[in-house]
């Protein structure tokens, strides 16, 4: 079983990968846009949700709060959907004879890698949330057990008043 540190480390690596994919996708989209303007063909833009997903992943790994994990999961799902739609759109309009074919192929490759990264990031976020939930439950249980022990000790200290007493089945009984 993975520890929290291993999950967070993996999440950070994937988030940096997603940021890299996002920046690369934006660069490929910009080159594609400039070439499309010269050829008077419609631009097949690559709006990259992976950049936002990567930034939220780094925030999630640092904060580890429930709301940030939910935000990151939502970004991963949006990145997944955006990557699938982008891939399908590019696959449908790409022609091998087009001068933009290498850029479309690069965009489709980045989308596939981004889809895989978003899928693994979503899974890791669920693992991290599960780990944090178990940790919080354990802390609460320990705190409750400790406060119960302290309350029991306080009761016995208050009732002793210097006279010897016995405790039977949780009840304090004076010997005199």
From Swiss-Prot:
It is a multi-pass membrane protein. The chain crosses the membrane at residues 11-31, 41-61, 67-87, 100-120. This is Transmembrane protein 196. Keywords: Cytoplasm, Membrane, Transmembrane, Transmembrane helix, Tumor suppressor. Its main location: cytoplasm. One of its GO terms (cellular component) is cytoplasm. It is found in: Cytoplasm; Membrane. Coiled coil: none annotated. The keyword Transferase does not apply. GO terms for biological process: negative regulation of canonical Wnt signaling pathway; negative regulation of cell growth; negative regulation of cell migration; negative regulation of cell population proliferation; positive regulation of apoptotic process. Acts as a tumor suppressor in lung cancer. Inhibits tumor cell growth by inhibiting cell proliferation and migration and promoting cell apoptosis. Inhibits metastasis of lung cancer by suppressing beta-catenin expression in the Wnt/beta-catenin signaling pathway. It comes from Rattus norvegicus.
């Amino acid at each position: 079983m993975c520890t929290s540190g291993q999950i967070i480390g993996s999440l950070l690596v994937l988030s940096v990968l997603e940021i890299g994919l996002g920046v690369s996708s934006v660069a490929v989209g910009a080159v594609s846009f400039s070439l499309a303007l010269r050829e008077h063909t419609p631009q097949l833009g690559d709006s990259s949700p992976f950049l936002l997903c990567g930034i939220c992943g780094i925030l999630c790994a640092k904060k580890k709060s429930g709301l940030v994990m939910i935000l990151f999961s939502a970004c991963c799902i949006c990145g997944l959907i955006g990557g699938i739609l982008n891939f399908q759109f590019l696959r449908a309009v790409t022609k091998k004879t087009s001068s933009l074919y290498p850029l479309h192929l690069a965009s489709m490759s980045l989308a596939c890698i981004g889809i895989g990264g978003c899928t693994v990031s979503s899974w890791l976020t669920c693992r991290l949330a599960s780990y944090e939930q178990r940790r919080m439950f354990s802390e609460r249980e320990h705190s409750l057990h400790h406060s119960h022990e302290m309350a029991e000790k306080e009761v016995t200290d208050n009732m002793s008043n210097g006279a010897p007493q016995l405790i039977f089945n949780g009840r304090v009984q004076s010997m005199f």
